[in-house]
């Protein structure tokens, strides 16, 4: 198989110079009241400071958030304006659900490949603690009509049509817009479709927490997770607060299913918690990085995105996106040294892992003769996954990329796959490598 790499027209690779993230915090804990735009400003500002980057060399910033704040629809531009960067720095926002920072990274990489920019920042941030609370459709329409009313009588007439239920706040939807099916219900679908047992789900969650705890204890994450002093500045957080330091496998069996209480197997412990956090990546043209004296963490070798139907098992995106990225890289699964898969739910991760090794799935769904390949668990999520770290939707992709490259470097180099499912039946995969 021919080895292929993502390069500019002059043959220069796309370098990932550095990556950084905030600690990931459970909803309504350390970052309670801190909006995503501020989390984005915090992490980008620290990335620049930590790596002594002159803000003037940043040509482009692409950032994203999934839970949109109406008052700051272009989070990327707000980050530029709020961090002392050059106000002429190009900035725009993207959203690809849970694969958002994969998308922002690819957008910057493509700009470098095209020769439009030399240096860019990509990333994402989300806050489940500062969510946009809406109003009912009837109240929203009435409020618009009130602005057009010309008399007190007209206003009173409009208000009289509202009932008490019309005045109640509307929380952000947790279900797919097109189907009304929640992520948890989809995880239950997948557990049933692919025969993922409750015991296996519990075991994966326990493994994730155990490995994340070990990684923190060994200091592996200290260099890629910053300390944050958040408002009201009475305390600080310097590590994730989602993982369970004393995870005991037997304790998982005591929990009841939450999405299908009668026949289900997915519990709160085998689902990622609602999380706040931000993450950013500094990318450069390979030659520019050398000119500036930076030693890159690694390089983007290839990437792939995929989309599938949303009505059934829509979190199978990694199984569709991964073969695209592998083919573009000229690689097989066995060639990889590390595999990092977003664990939205234990059932989702296990279903994808199972289908990676299924010839039937490859032939019927992917149009391939052979399976993607069986996953070697010694390579899989070796530092734990999203079940332990948490999942600020737009930040997870950047976490996966940075964490994988740092671990590859600790192991002496190599090639790693990062992949994630996303709402809307989307999937993302990116292959990264070190020198």
Swiss-Prot record:
GO cellular component terms, A-Z: cytosol
Reactions catalysed, as given in the entry: an acyl-CoA + acetyl-CoA = a 3-oxoacyl-CoA + CoA
Location within or outside the cell: Cytoplasm
Main location: cytoplasm
An annotated GO BP: fatty acid beta-oxidation
A Pfam family the protein falls into: Thiolase_N
Active-site residue numbers: 98, 391, 421
Cited Gene3D superfamilies: 3.40.47.10
PROSITE patterns referenced in this protein's UniProt entry, alphabetically: THIOLASE_2, THIOLASE_3
Pathway noted in the entry: Lipid metabolism; fatty acid beta-oxidation
Keyword field contains Transferase: yes
EC category: transferase
Transmembrane segments: none
EC number: 2.3.1.16
Domain of life where this protein originates: Bacteria
GO molecular function: acetyl-CoA C-acyltransferase activity
Keyword field: Acyltransferase, Cytoplasm, Fatty acid metabolism, Lipid degradation, Lipid metabolism, Transferase
Coiled coil: none
Subunit note: Heterotetramer of two alpha chains (FadJ) and two beta chains (FadI).
Protein purpose: Catalyzes the final step of fatty acid oxidation in which acetyl-CoA is released and the CoA ester of a fatty acid two carbons shorter is formed.
Stated family: Belongs to the thiolase-like superfamily. Thiolase family.
Protein name: 3-ketoacyl-CoA thiolase
Gene coding for it: fadI
